[in-house]
UniProtKB/Swiss-Prot annotation:
Subcellular location: Secreted
A single GO molecular function term of this UniProt record: neurohypophyseal hormone activity
Protein's UniProt name: Isotocin
A single cellular component GO annotation: extracellular region
Upper classification of the organism: Eukaryota, Metazoa, Chordata, Craniata, Vertebrata
Amino acid sequence: CYISNCPIG
């Protein structure tokens, strides 16, 4: 992911 929006993006 880009920011902290995903669990393990």
